[in-house]
Amino acid sequence: MAGADVDVGTELRLGLPGGGGGAAEAAAKAAKRGFEETIDLKLKLPTAGMEEAAAGKAEAPAAEKAKRPAEAAAADAEKPPAPKAQAVGWPPVRSFRRNIMTVQSVKSKKEEEADKQQQQPAANASGSNSSAFVKVSMDGAPYLRKVDLKMYNSYKDLSLALQKMFGTFTATGNNMNEVNGSDAVTTYEDKDGDWMLVGDVPWQMFVESCKRLRIMKGSEAIGLAPRAKDKYKNKS
């Protein structure tokens, strides 16, 4: 068999120069290509077919990415437009309406001030007519009473009311003989904290300055009358 191969390789053939070697060259190239591909596969190198397949796969994602923006734009075009928010202060207020609103606000302020001024005298009047309750105590009595001084118009009215409350005679006045001869005398504490006899000042001054009343023994109230006189003389 080896001899036959040698004969084929060394066999002389008839033909044009260079025309007889075409088949041999093609066979040699095919054998070389097969040898190179075998080596590439063993070394895990990419062959020509593998490179073409990879290029095809790379082109497919690029085409899909190019399609996505176009599809998103088409979907946005199909959506209805969002409603526009109404601007604050729209529609604009005309000038004459604005002037009317300004005049109304000024009028309301003036009316409020007028109402306050009208209410102020009424509040003062009600305050002046308010009650003036004071406590009344009597030495030896086991209870206290309260009287509204503004319910009486004079010392005489107050004395009669106290007699009904405590059932005893109470002297009011700055006469020392009256104080000495009475069993009980009505005194009061003023705003300064001083104790004085009831009746030693004008009635209205007494009502404004009295804090509380006390019915005490006449012997204990002897020194109060002169002190009350001196006090109000100095004030006058």
From Swiss-Prot:
Induction: By auxin. Down-regulated by auxin depletion, and light in dark-grown seedlings. Its main location: nucleus. Gene3D superfamilies: Phosphatidylinositol 3-kinase Catalytic Subunit, Chain A, domain 1. GO terms for cellular component: nucleus. Residues 62-81 have a biased composition (Basic and acidic residues). Highly expressed in etiolated seedlings. Expressed in roots and flowers. This is Auxin-responsive protein IAA13.
